[in-house]
Amino acid sequence: SETKLFCKFNREIERGTTLTYKPVFKENKEFVQCCYLDNRLGVWNALELCETITDGAIAFSCWEEHGGGTAGFLARFLYEKYNVSKALISDITWITEGVHHGNGVVISLRDTGIPRKIFVDQILAHAKESGIPFQTEVEGSGGSDGTEIQKIPYPIDWCFIGAPEDNVHTPAEKVHKKDIESMVNLYRYLLEKL
């Protein structure tokens, strides 16, 4: 069923006014649910990694949803200054026909951007040896900061890895706790191995 969103006011809203969803955080044994989980969980995962990372960089980008975000600039800076040539994109993907709640974090094999196969194969091999639950996706649309990194003239490998969510871009985005746990655990494992 399709959800309809609307604003009910006694006056007309001025064009260009920024509107946001009112956060109503819900949690049960299996799921967390709230607006903007696609942004919040990617950042939360990266912050969790700050507790254990010893050799690497964590960067926070913006404007990914609009294209032309800061990922390309950040990747260039990290490559030129610190010779960082591998990037893991910590974000949230969508529940689709082949991606389900509770089956683990999702390793994206491609979306509108196509990461280098040898790097993705390396990640898949590490994921298999880790024993951490994961699933894979192949998408023909959508994109991530990886797509922006792919467009810059630097040899930076990238891969999108994130928990899947339902009700994308609504006030009721929903993610399974097992998928969040496997996301954090796989990132920790990969940061040690890559």
Regions found by a protein language model. Give the residues of each.
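N-terminal hydrophobic/helix-forming segments and targeting peptides
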Residues: 1-194
